């Protein structure tokens, strides 16, 4: 994948380059971004696409189709427990990825290591029933895989969001599209498999093998694609050496003038580098000494590199990046992203698609519709017309995020059948899904483009912080959903 350096005309921020204008190396990075997005959510989607298998996992683990569970409360709420363990683990682990000792780990090790852990999660779910265990062993397996999945996802997700935060925004949009496409693929496969295979003991077992096999296959391809990315010249322009060796770019400095931004979207220079002031923005292998000093005490770590040294590695630059200073600069996009996913995971899937439990197809079709329009929303930032017209109009994204609170009464009323009919539910899933994808993706794209995020080290940290915002909002939303459904079941 090693090609000559890419020279192109300036590219507007938020506008993806036409496919016929791309070099092979640039197109390959888009493919990798998409595959990373798909792989990020595949384990969770694979598990949720075969609920009958997980809810009766004890039978397969005990190798007894007639087994009667002793831990009925656990198996009645196994999906909730699995999801909650994964989210809480991610919420604890992902902020730890910003600690200096973790940032010293080469990024390629983090990417590949996180992906391997996600693959191990699915392998464990498949191996335990093959070997056999007790019901208590099955419970322990579900809890352990929830923890393993949350641990691996926190490493892979934070590194992926951070890495593509250093690229032009269209790469983040593509990655977010991959996250949504993961749900579309599993939903579509669920419809096909549900129509083709019976809901018997053996039929459900075959369904699980299809979902889990697809997951491992996609993640295996992503693993290979990430290894090849190390030799991609376009990726090296933006992300240097992936933390493997000393950067080819000499240590330099960025003048304080680079901190001054206009209200216009940043553009890219002839090599596609992000530039908002007409000056070259150094790659993630250069030193931002003057810029760090201009930020004040919060950025004291960033001034630790001498002016004239051999180019440090990418992860060394990350260690020298101030976290709280970066968080202050992305705070509004952080809040918008967190609240967006709070509303989504509060209502979806339990409340938004669970109002017709006796219907064989409503929940399946409703989830599919949500996933399709969620993907469309996630890809929408690739269109320039979907962007705020100026930097000052970024408040629109924050307002749109908080405006999504209107879905709470609309879907709760439908859930309690005060608003009857399945057609209403399908229409709501269209709007609900698109708004989730658009607001979430736009916030993730705009976060690393905030004023003061003027080098790739800060963009990496900003991208990681935006990933954490998803977990913060998602955790609160999931807890609220559990509380709401518990009250609903009680009263």
From Swiss-Prot:
The chain crosses the membrane at residues 27-47, 82-102, 109-129, 136-156, 173-193, 209-229, 333-353, 361-381, 395-415, 427-447, 460-480. The keyword Glycoprotein applies. Its main location: membrane. It catalyses: adenosine(in) + H(+)(in) = adenosine(out) + H(+)(out); uridine(in) + H(+)(in) = uridine(out) + H(+)(out). GO terms for cellular component: plasma membrane. Keywords: Glycoprotein, Membrane, Transmembrane, Transmembrane helix, Transport. InterPro entries: ENT1/ENT2, Eqnu_transpt. Residues 260-273 have a biased composition (Basic and acidic residues). Residues 260-280, 290-309 are annotated as: Disordered. It is found in: Membrane. Glycans are attached at residue 274. One of its GO terms (molecular function) is nucleoside transmembrane transporter activity. This is Nucleoside transporter 1.1. Sodium-independent high affinity nucleoside:H(+) symporter; transports adenosine and uridine. Can transport cytidine and thymidine. It is a multi-pass membrane protein. Belongs to the SLC29A/ENT transporter (TC 2.A.57) family.
């Amino acid at each position: 994948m090693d090609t000559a350096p890419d020279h192109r005309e300036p590219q507007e921020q938020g506008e993806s380059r036409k496919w016929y204008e791309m070099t092979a190396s640039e197109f390959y990075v888009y493919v990798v971004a998409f595959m990373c997005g798909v792989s990020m959510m595949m384990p969770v989607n694979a598990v949720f696409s075969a609920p009958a298998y997980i809810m009766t996992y004890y039978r397969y683990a005990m190798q007894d189709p007639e087994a009667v569970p002793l831990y009925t409360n656990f198996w009645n709420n196994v999906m909730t427990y699995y999801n909650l363990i994964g989210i809480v683990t991610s919420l604890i682990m992902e902020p730890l990825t910003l600690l200096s000792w973790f940032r010293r780990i080469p990024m390629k090790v983090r990417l590949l290591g996180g992906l391997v852990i996600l693959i191990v999660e699915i392998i464990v779910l498949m191996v335990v029933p093959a070997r056999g265990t007790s019901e208590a062993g099955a419970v322990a397996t579900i809890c352990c895989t929830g923890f393993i999945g949350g641990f691996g996802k926190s490493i892979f997700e934070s590194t992926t969001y951070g890495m593509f935060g250093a690229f032009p925004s269209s790469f983040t949009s593509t990655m977010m599209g991959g996250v949504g496409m993961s749900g579309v693929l599993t939903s579509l496969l669920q419809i096909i498999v549900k129509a083709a295979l019976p809901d018997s003991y053996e039929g459900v077992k075959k369904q699980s093998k299809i979902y889990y096999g697809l997951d491992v296959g996609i993640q295996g391809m992503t693993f290979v694609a990430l290894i090849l990315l190390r030799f991609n010249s376009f990726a090296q322009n933006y992300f240097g050496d992936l933390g493997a060796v000393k950067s080819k770019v000499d240590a330099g400095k960025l003048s304080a003038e680079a901190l001054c931004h206009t209200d216009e979207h940043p553009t890219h220079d002839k090599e596609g580098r992000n530039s908002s002031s007409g000056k070259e923005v150094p790659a993630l292998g250069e030193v931002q000494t003057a810029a760090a000093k201009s930020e004040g005490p919060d950025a004291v770590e960033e001034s630790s590199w001498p002016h004239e040294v051999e180019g440090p590695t990418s992860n060394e630059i990350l260690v020298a990046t101030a976290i709280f200073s970066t968080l202050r600069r992305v705070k509004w996009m952080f809040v918008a992203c967190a609240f967006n996913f709070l509303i989504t995971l509060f209502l979806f899937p339990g409340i938004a698609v669970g109002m017709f439990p006796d219907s064989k197809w409503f929940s399946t079709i409703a989830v599919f519709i949500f996933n399709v329009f969620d993907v469309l929303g996630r890809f929408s930032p690739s269109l320039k017309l979907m962007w705020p017209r100026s930097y000052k109009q970024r408040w629109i994204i924050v307002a749109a995020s908080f405006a999504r609170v209107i879905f709470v009464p609309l879907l709760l009323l439908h859930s309690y059948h005060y608003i009857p009919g399945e057609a209403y539910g399908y229409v709501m899933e269209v709007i609900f899904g698109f708004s989730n994808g658009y607001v979430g993706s736009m916030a993730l794209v705009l976060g690393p483009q905030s004023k003061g995020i003027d080098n790739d080290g800060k963009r990496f940290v900003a991208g990681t912080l935006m990933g954490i915002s998803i977990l913060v909002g998602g955790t609160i939303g999931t807890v609220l959903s559990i509380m709401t459904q518990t009250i609903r079941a009680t009263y």
